[in-house]
Each structure stands twice: as structure tokens, then as C-alpha cells.
């Protein structure tokens, strides 16, 4: 009888191995949801710690668990990279993984959540100077505002916008591209805007994989730092006056102001007391009217008052003040003329008197008749020598 020999045994393995979930992308960069690469796909996974593990198989597909892009391929690594592909825009690609143990038992198939190929930049929208409507002029001296709508990226989505500023359309001679996040407005501060210079804001969008859109540019906004210009202001509502004895009202009018750029928005008026250098009536918006009457006043006799007018344009610039030549409040009648002398002949009467010295004298009234202290007005004169008949 021979000596018996024994094999080293065989273990019956009826249990399938386990396998983790594959992740799209390379190790250390997190889960990849989108990519711009059309040539390759990468996946990685945590190692299976079971001692019976023999190898892994991976595939890439356009459906979960499939292998239409890369068929099942054996590996002992925990990363799979495939090249020389021709991936399609907006298509989702899945990494699929299974493990085999030493007995040849396969694990279940585990699939990634997929990576979408994004080859194109965002779609551009509309941009305007301003927030709610397109502005043509700005009164700002150090900032510009723009807003935009209808930008879109239907695959990976918009990650951020960039803006720049120039003095010609599309140029960036004032401010180079500046990232501002996924916002729809920009208040570009820290600028030095020059009067009557037109500025253009350009914007572009970048999606989550780095594709950028075409550039869109505003139609331009012009800095307007000068207020409206006036010409003449006149005391009274018609012909200019220099004196009045009304203490409770004051009237004036003026030629409409003009503004070459943003345009006149409204006039403002005030009543100024020249004598005590203060405003009797403060500045009031009177719209585009060119006449004003102040009521309910308490004017002071002997004081001179001027009408002050200024214009405000559409972007808020206030122009220089123009003023009337002033009205003296006069409540004192001139004294009666002195030293009246009359020379009588058969053909005429010559009257002469000492001229009054009041600076506000208007004229003399000459009365005549056949009785003492006649009341019939014959005429008026500025001179102190007249012929009555």
C-alpha cells in the first residue's frame, strides 16, 4: 500500500465580492459632473478590502451599467483612463465597475452618477447701461452701472461673469476683464469719468467647465457733468421793473434754460434779499415753467430783491444761477416839488421848479385848470421845466 498524500485543500466560495461606487474624474479633485474634454474619460474608486478580491472590470457607457463606449476591461488598479474618444456635447457618460474574487464570482455593477460633456460657452443676452432701462447719460463722476438678462448655459450652467470698461465699443482701455461672480448687475466704482466722454461696458460669461461666451457690449453712456445754462431773468411777469410797493407778492420770468446733453429736467427759483444777503424764499422746483409769482411774502421796505433761477438736467446736474437786476421795495412817495415858478404870456405858460433828488423818482405830473389847486392832469414829464400851454 502506498503512502497517502493530501492536497492543500480548496475553499468553497459562494459569496459575491463587493465593490464601491466609481467617481468621475481624477483622484483628489472631487466628483466631476461636467467636462469640456472630448477625448478622454477618467474614473476612480476606493479599493475593495476583501482578501478574496482578484481584479476589477470597468466600462464606460451612455447608459447606467452599459458598455457602448468602452467595453468591460479588466484591471487591478483603482483608476481607469481612456483616451482617443470622440465625445458628444451635452451627452452624459457613466463609469461602470464590478469586481471578481478568486473563485470568479462577480460583484454587482456599480455606476457613477455620470459626467456631462459641455463643449460650448453660454448663450449671450442683452446688456444695458443702467438697471431698469437703457440710459444715455450719467451724472456720476466715478462709477458706471450696467445690467444684463437672458444669458444662459443649458448644460453645466454659468459659473461667473466678467466685465470691462472702455471708451470705444468692445475696448477695455479703462478697466480690463474683472470677475464678478454669477450676478446680473455691476456697479463699477473707482473710475474717473471725463465730461462728455462716452463709456462702454462689456460683459462675458464663463460656464462651470471654463467655456466662455461671446462678448456683449452696451451701446454706450456719456458722462454729463455740466448743468443747464440760462440767459436772462426779469423782474415782473412782463416788462422789467425796478420798483414796487407790494409787500406780499413778487413776480418774475426768464428765458428757458438749455442743456446740450441730457437735457433740461426742470427749473428752480428762489427770491433773494440783496440788502441782507439772505434768501426770502428758498429754492423751489417749478418744472419747465418760465414764470413765477411768490405769494404770502413779508417784504421789507427799502430792501432790494432779486429773482434767482437755475436749471437741473436729466442726470441731476445743477447749472449756474442767473439773477434779475433787482426790485427796490418803495413805500415812500416823493416830496412835492419845491420852488415852483411860472412865467405867463399871452401865448404860453412856462413852469420851472427845483428838481427832486430821490433816486427812485419816476416822473412829475402837471395839473391845470381855472381854479385853485386844479385836479385835471395835463401831462407827465421827466424834466423840471415844462410848457403848460
Where are these regions (language model features)?
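Recognizes extended acidic, P/S/T-rich segments that occur
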Residues: 33, 59-88, 162-194, 270-300, ...
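Pro/Thr/Ser/Gly-rich low-complexity, intrinsically disordered linker/stalk tracts
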Residues: 4-48, 111-152, 215-257, 323-360
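Short, solvent-exposed loop/turn segments at the edges of extracellular beta-sandwich modules
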Residues: 1, 100-105, 206-211, 312-317
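Extracellular acidic loop/turn motifs
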Residues: 47-54, 65-66, 150-158, 170-171, ...
Amino acid at each position: 500500500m502506498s503512502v497517502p498524500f493530501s492536497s492543500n485543500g480548496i475553499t468553497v466560495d459562494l459569496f459575491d465580492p463587493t465593490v464601491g461606487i466609481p467617481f468621475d474624474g481624477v483622484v483628489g479633485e472631487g466628483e466631476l459632473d461636467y467636462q469640456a474634454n472630448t477625448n478622454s474619460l477618467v474614473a476612480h474608486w476606493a479599493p475593495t478590502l476583501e482578501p478574496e478580491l482578484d481584479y476589477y472590470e470597468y466600462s464606460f457607457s451612455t447608459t447606467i451599467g452599459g458598455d457602448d463606449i468602452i467595453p468591460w476591461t479588466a484591471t487591478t488598479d483603482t483608476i481607469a483612463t481612456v483616451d482617443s474618444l470622440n465625445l458628444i456635447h451635452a451627452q452624459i457618460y457613466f463609469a461602470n465597475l464590478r469586481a471578481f474574487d478568486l473563485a470568479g464570482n462577480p460583484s454587482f455593477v456599480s455606476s457613477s452618477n455620470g459626467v456631462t460633456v459641455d463643449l460650448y460657452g453660454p448663450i449671450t443676452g442683452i446688456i444695458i447701461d443702467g438697471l431698469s432701462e437703457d440710459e444715455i447719460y450719467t451724472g456720476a463722476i466715478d462709477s458706471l452701472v450696467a445690467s444684463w438678462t437672458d444669458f444662459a448655459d443649458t448644460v453645466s450652467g454659468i459659473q461667473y461673469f466678467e466685465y470691462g470698461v472702455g471708451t470705444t465699443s468692445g475696448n477695455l482701455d479703462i478697466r480690463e476683464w474683472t470677475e464678478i461672480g454669477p450676478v446680473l448687475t455691476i456697479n463699477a466704482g473707482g473710475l474717473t469719468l471725463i465730461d462728455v466722454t462716452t463709456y462702454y461696458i462689456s460683459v462675458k460669461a464663463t460656464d462651470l467647465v471654463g467655456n466662455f461666451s461671446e462678448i456683449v457690449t452696451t451701446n454706450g453712456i456719456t458722462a454729463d457733468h455740466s448743468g443747464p445754462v440760462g440767459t436772462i431773468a426779469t423782474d415782473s411777469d412782463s416788462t422789467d421793473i425796478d420798483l414796487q410797493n407790494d409787500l406780499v407778492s413778487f413776480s418774475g420770468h426768464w428765458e428757458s434754460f438749455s442743456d446740450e446733453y441730457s437735457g433740461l429736467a426742470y427749473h428752480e427759483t428762489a427770491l433773494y434779499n440783496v440788502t441782507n444777503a439772505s434768501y426770502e424764499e428758498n429754492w423751489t422746483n417749478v418744472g419747465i415753467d418760465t414764470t413765477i409769482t411768490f405769494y404770502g411774502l413779508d417784504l421789507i421796505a427799502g430792501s432790494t430783491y432779486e429773482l434767482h433761477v437755475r436749471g437741473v438736467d436729466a442726470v441731476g446736474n445743477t447749472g449756474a444761477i442767473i439773477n434779475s437786476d433787482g426790485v427796490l421795495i418803495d413805500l415812500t412817495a416823493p416830496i412835492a416839488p419845491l420852488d415852483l415858478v411860472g412865467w405867463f404870456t399871452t401865448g404860453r405858460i412856462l413852469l420851472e421848479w427845483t428838481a427832486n433828488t430821490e433816486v427812485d423818482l419816476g416822473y412829475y405830473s402837471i395839473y391845470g385848470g381855472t381854479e385853485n389847486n386844479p385836479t385835471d392832469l395835463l401831462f407827465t414829464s421827466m424834466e423840471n421845466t415844462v410848457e403848460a400851454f
